[in-house]
């Protein structure tokens, strides 16, 4: 019989595939005999409960999902490295900034904030910019956004704010009537609303947006000296956003544009870079600001920035769920030389972010590879679901799960002790002094180009015009009028709100 050369090659190829094929197994490692047909009682009989492969397959399928993040649900991540641009040990004893050229591995997760996991990435929203530094002192998480401020200054309002921005419990639709009703009683949101309704609220790509730590943090040096700092990631790709017409066009073509762009560019070797800058203020200088420097609704105006390093993202995750979805960020993940400030919003986030990760991933989340520190972990935390650690990991210490012990000498690092902070006053429950809710929104508005101002009015009035309550609409316009008269006047015209009513409300 004559066989063609091509037929022989195909046959040899199939044989090769057969020889090297991996056997399909169940989770217990046992081989699967048939993955196409269930076990039945006869040709047309019922499926048998003894079909353990079928049962396990369905059980595992039903348990594939973990709880969605309550905020920042839609996200994408990438690996990379941070390289210090100098020696900043005079300011902080944290290792990423200890010497020029110091390399620290990082994992970054970008995200939308309010919208759900499968939502379009074109929707207007702040964008999360969370960076996990795998330092030799432990993991440090810088958990920020692409905008420098936030809607509220006290974490006690965070659940209310998120509830107002999330879909209605009745219709399951996001509704401007709900969130502007909330914001009409929160003048502190004026600055952030101005930021998010500029075109920065619809970035063209994750590569072309800046990032901010939002809050003030403390840097502590070897001498125990304290300075307050704010962090700013500056994109080397420049900042590019989508204008209103572009948003509509992009959403119609690809509502995953942010993820697609990041993956495509990194896989093509076009690695995005960000320079990290810090603003530094001594406690005395912070106290002299004419607004509260610990207020998360404020930018530190006219404070110079200092470059401290550059981050490069150079690898996308091998598996989205294992790395991006299971990555867990929390501002409470800090290292020696960095401490939280007294910012009231940050103080609440220290608890809330860590707690929500425990809810999503369980008590042993730090054993997941993406969350596991590169530095050694030694403590007496034990057990819990999916635990695969023996704590200290030392055979000689397996029986000792407490401290102190004469059997196992587990020491502490005094450099990691909390810095001494002088306190005065009384326990109280009061709003901050000197809130100055409107002036920075005016500064931002006046800094915009005429085109950006027009887009801001278009974007903001588009949602305000969906508000049915005339009083809520007028109050909101009055806030923007108090920020800048031109801003408020143009917005009143675009929303058909009586300007006399606006000026009256603004003067109250």
From Swiss-Prot:
GO terms for cellular component: cytoplasm; periplasmic space. One of its GO terms (molecular function) is catalase activity. This is Catalase. CDD domains: catalase_clade_1 (cd08154). Its cofactor is heme. It catalyses: 2 H2O2 = O2 + 2 H2O. Its main location: periplasm. Residues 373-392 have a biased composition (Polar residues). The keyword Metal-binding applies. Belongs to the catalase family. Decomposes hydrogen peroxide into water and oxygen; serves to protect cells from the toxic effects of hydrogen peroxide. One of its GO terms (biological process) is response to hydrogen peroxide. It is found in: Periplasm. It holds the Pfam family Catalase-rel. Its EC number is 1.11.1.6. Keywords: Heme, Hydrogen peroxide, Iron, Metal-binding, Oxidoreductase, Periplasm, Peroxidase, Signal. Residues 1-21 form the signal peptide. Residues 373-396 are annotated as: Disordered. The active site is at residues 72, 145. The lineage of its organism: Bacteria, Pseudomonadati, Pseudomonadota, Gammaproteobacteria, Vibrionales. Heme binds at residue 353. It comes from the Bacteria. The keyword Nucleus does not apply. Gene3D superfamilies: Catalase core domain (2.40.180.10).
């Amino acid at each position: 019989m004559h066989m063609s050369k091509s037929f022989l090659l195909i046959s040899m190829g199939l044989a090769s595939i057969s020889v090297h094929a991996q056997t399909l197994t169940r989770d217990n490692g046992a081989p699967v005999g048939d993955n196409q047909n269930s076990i039945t009682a006869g040709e047309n009989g019922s499926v048998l409960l003894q079909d353990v492969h079928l049962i396990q397959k369905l059980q595992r399928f039903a348990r594939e999902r973990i709880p969605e993040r309550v905020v920042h649900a839609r996200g994408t991540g990438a690996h990379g490295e941070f390289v210090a641009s100098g020696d900043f040990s005079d300011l902080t004893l944290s290792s990423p900034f200890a010497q020029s050229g110091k390399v620290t591995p990082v994992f970054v997760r970008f995200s939308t904030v309010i919208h759900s996991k499968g939502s379009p990435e074109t929707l207007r929203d702040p964008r999360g910019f969370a960076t996990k530094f795998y330092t030799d002192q432990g993991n440090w998480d810088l958990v920020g956004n692409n905008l420098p401020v936030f809607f509220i200054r006290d974490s006690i309002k965070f659940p209310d704010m998120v509830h107002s921005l999330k879909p209605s419990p009745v219709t399951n639709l996001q509704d401007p009537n709900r969130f502007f009703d909330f914001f009409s009683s929160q003048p502190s949101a004026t600055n952030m609303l101005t930021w998010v309704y500029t075109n920065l609220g619809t970035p063209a790509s994750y590569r072309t947006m800046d990032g901010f730590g939002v809050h003030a943090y403390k840097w502590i040096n070897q001498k125990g000296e304290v300075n307050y700092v704010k962090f700013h990631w500056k994109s080397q790709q420049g900042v590019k956003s989508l204008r209103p017409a572009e948003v509509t066009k992009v959403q119609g073509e690809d509502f995953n544009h942010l993820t697609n762009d990041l993956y495509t560019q990194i896989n093509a070797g076009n690695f995005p870079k960000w320079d990290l800058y810090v603003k530094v203020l001594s406690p005395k200088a912070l106290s002299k600001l004419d607004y509260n420097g610990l207020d998360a609704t404020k930018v530190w105006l006219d404070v110079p920035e200092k470059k401290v390093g550059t981050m490069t993202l150079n690898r996308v995750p091998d598996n989205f769920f294992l790395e991006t979805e299971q990555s867990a960020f929390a501002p409470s993940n800090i290292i020696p030389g960095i401490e939280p400030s007294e910012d009231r919003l940050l103080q609440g986030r220290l608890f809330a972010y860590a707690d929500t990760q425990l809810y999503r991933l369980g008590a042993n989340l730090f054993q997941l590879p993406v969350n596991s520190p590169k530095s050694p972990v030694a403590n007496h935390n034990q057990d819990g679901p999916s635990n695969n650690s023996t704590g200290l990991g030392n055979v000689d210490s397996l029986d000792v799960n407490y401290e102190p012990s004469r059997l196992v000498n587990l020491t502490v690092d005094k450099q990691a002790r909390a810095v001494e902070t002088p306190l005065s006053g009384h326990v109280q429950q009061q709003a901050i002094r000197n809130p100055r809710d409107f002036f920075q929104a005016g500064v931002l508005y006046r800094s915009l180009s005429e085109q950006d101002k027009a887009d801001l009015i278009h974007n903001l009035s588009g949602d305000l015009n969906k508000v049915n309550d005339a009083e809520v609409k007028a109050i909101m316009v009055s806030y923007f009028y108090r920020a800048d008269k031109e801003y408020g006047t143009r917005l009143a015209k675009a929303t058909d709100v009586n300007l006399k009513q606006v000026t009256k409300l603004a003067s109250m």
